[in-house]
Amino acid sequence: MEEIFQFFKRDPERRKHKKEFLASLNVQARALQRPFGFIAVVAWIHFGFNLDPRLHPEFPELFYFRIALTAAGVFVLTASFFERLRGKGLGLLYLLAVFSFLSCSFFTGRIADDAGYVSGLQILVITTTAVPFALRTLFVFYAISIFLFIAAIQIYQPALNTDAAIYSMNNLVLSYAVGFVLAWILDRYRFTMLINQFRL
């Protein structure tokens, strides 16, 4: 039992190297601004102009969610070429997370009975762990995401009593659980790599 507590016990070096760790996350984030910005520009264009109108004509507002991410991607991609605009690094990635992960959480909640769209949210839940966010920040994004998803379900009442919908919801819950574990592992790995640099 003591070994288990030691495994989850917070490393005292965390507090000592908090600023250095955040600085290292910002450095990693700066390297991802351009590729993530480009991906954001093109990721949802086909959905917005082609698939969404055919699959969910009752939800025309979905187009604006898609275009908002494209606009955010254009801004991030452009800003990444200007030193004054790109900031320390994480700021622009926070912007992309809001327009992709959080907006997807809300509009997927509205059409949560569509397993295809729920699977798209599952992809974002997992891939967001690869972004060099601080663990606490990522958990905040997860909490907001879950809140927005549930709020949209309560507001729009999609039919979730079918076997397909229940199966899809189970997979979504699992994706959040896996995301939490992956985020924790990656956070420990990033911090360990930083400490190893100090010890070299």
Functional labels for PLM-detected ranges:
Residues 1-28, 39-44, 55-57, 93-95, ...:
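Non-catalytic regulatory/interaction regions at protein termini and inter-domain linkers
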Residues 26-42, 58-67, 132-143, 164-172:
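Alpha-helical transmembrane segments and their helix-membrane boundary motifs
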Residues 35-128, 145-147:
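Hydrophobic transmembrane alpha-helices and their membrane-interface boundaries in multi-pass
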Residues 54-55, 59, 85, 156-160, ...:
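Membrane-interfacial segments
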Residues 149-172:
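Interfacial aromatic-anchored transmembrane helix boundaries in multi-pass membrane proteins
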Residues 173-200:
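Juxtamembrane or sensor-core-proximal signal-transducing alpha helices
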